[in-house]
């Protein structure tokens, strides 16, 4: 039985639109009604996220609903996996891609002929709901953590609005670092933040972690990229958080702030900033540390050398390279 949102009928259309906007409506089942109530099938989502986007009374229930009869068309991945099997097997074309707002970013090697790159871009444009398609021309690089992109199909623009976890974000995929694959990680942090927390987001970018911490008392959002801070300010206004989030354009090493919850989302270089994080965090506070590695041991030893701490939680966020992962560790700092 699908998970359903039980609401009063009078809120039906508005609620349906909000669920669609946030990609939470389960389209495999039909919406049904009984008496004064509607039952809207939804995807698995935390109740707190629903409360943050729906200003109405609701109940989460499991209910038998009629399945939609859908004639399934071949997906983008299915088509390219057949048409370009050789290039995929050689590691030149990846079946994975990112969706940021209404833009798609593919992973296709420079070694693939331009004509084929364009063909794949057009396929993505037709089969993935989007307005524009790009491919990565480089890895993330430089002080601002951005990558070169090549336009393949659709609209040739890089600015978009991305929606996740009940909030919206302006993102320019050519000028700032942003990973939609960390949406689940941001939802995890969102649940941990309390009303009295003072959060310091050391590498804030356009503010996805800062805005996820919206229930905190105060959030310092720091970044060295002026384009990121410009969009962060727009995102603060877009999500009506002017009274909570303080944007700071600076190298974090030059900023003098304190907090009881520190976010270090800079996996490749976070180890270089541990001393600064320990300077920022209050004793008894928590550091959310992101790094790249084969296991958790190296990160734990780094912290244990510098302070009295305990690991509250550790998890693999996603694969980074063969036998390497983006790792998340939550450290409670008992004494510095």
From Swiss-Prot:
SUPFAM superfamilies: S-adenosyl-L-methionine-dependent methyltransferases
Signal peptide coordinates: none
A single GO BP: tRNA methylation
Keyword Lipid biosynthesis: no
Mutation effect (residue 205 to A): 33-fold decrease in methyltransferase activity and reduced affinity for tRNA
Family classification: Belongs to the class I-like SAM-binding methyltransferase superfamily. TRM5/TYW2 family.
Effect of residue 226 to A: 16-fold decrease in methyltransferase activity
Cellular compartment(s): Cytoplasm
Any one Gene Ontology molecular-function term assigned to this protein's record: tRNA methyltransferase activity
Protein name: tRNA (guanine(37)-N(1))-methyltransferase Trm5b
This protein's UniProt keywords: Cytoplasm, Methyltransferase, S-adenosyl-L-methionine, Transferase, tRNA processing
Catalyzed chemical reaction(s): guanosine(37) in tRNA + S-adenosyl-L-methionine = N(1)-methylguanosine(37) in tRNA + S-adenosyl-L-homocysteine + H(+)
Reported function: Specifically methylates the N1 position of guanosine-37 in various tRNAs.
Binding site for S-adenosyl-L-methionine: 186, 223-224, 251-252, 265
Effect of residue 145 to A: 16-fold decrease in methyltransferase activity. Lack of tRNA-binding
Gene that specifies this protein: trm5b
Record Gene3D superfamilies: 3.30.70.2580, Met-10+ protein-like domains, Vaccinia Virus protein VP39
Entry keyword annotation includes Transferase: yes
């Amino acid at each position: 039985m699908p998970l359903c949102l039980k609401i009063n009928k009078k809120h039906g259309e508005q609620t349906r639109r909000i669920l669609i906007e946030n990609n939470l409506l389960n389209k495999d089942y039909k919406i049904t009604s009984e008496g004064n109530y509607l039952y809207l099938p939804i995807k698995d989502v935390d109740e707190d996220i629903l409360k943050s986007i729906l200003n109405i009374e609701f109940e989460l229930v499991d209910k038998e609903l009629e399945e939609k009869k859908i004639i399934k068309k071949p997906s983008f991945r299915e088509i390219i996996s057949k048409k370009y099997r050789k290039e995929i097997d050689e590691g030149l074309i990846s079946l994975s891609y990112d969706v940021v707002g209404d833009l798609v970013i593919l992973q296709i090697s420079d070694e693939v002929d331009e004509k084929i790159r364009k063909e794949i871009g057009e396929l993505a444009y037709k089969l993935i709901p989007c307005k524009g398609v790009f491919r990565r021309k480089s890895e993330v690089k430089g002080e601002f953590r951005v990558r070169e992109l090549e336009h393949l199909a659709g609209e040739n623009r890089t600015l978009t609005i991305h929606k996740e976890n009940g909030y919206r974000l302006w993102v320019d995929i050519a000028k700032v670092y942003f990973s939609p694959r960390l949406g689940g990680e941001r939802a995890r942090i969102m649940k941990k933040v309390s009303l009295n927390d003072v959060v310091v987001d050391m590498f804030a970018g356009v503010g996805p972690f800062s805005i996820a911490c919206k229930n905190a008392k105060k959030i310092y959002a720091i970044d060295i990229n002026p384009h990121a801070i410009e969009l962060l300010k727009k995102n603060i206004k877009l999500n009506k958080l002017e009274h909570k989030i303080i944007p700071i354009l600076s190298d974090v090493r030059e900023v003098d702030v304190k907090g009881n919850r520190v976010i270090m989302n800079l996996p490749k270089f976070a180890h270089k900033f541990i001393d600064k994080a320990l300077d920022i965090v209050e004793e008894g506070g928590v550091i959310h540390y992101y790094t790249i590695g084969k296991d958790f041991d190296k990160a734990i030893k780094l912290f244990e050398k510098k302070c009295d701490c305990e690991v509250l939680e550790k998890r693999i966020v996603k694969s980074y390279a063969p036998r390497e992962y983006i790792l998340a560790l939550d450290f409670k700092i008992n004494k510095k």
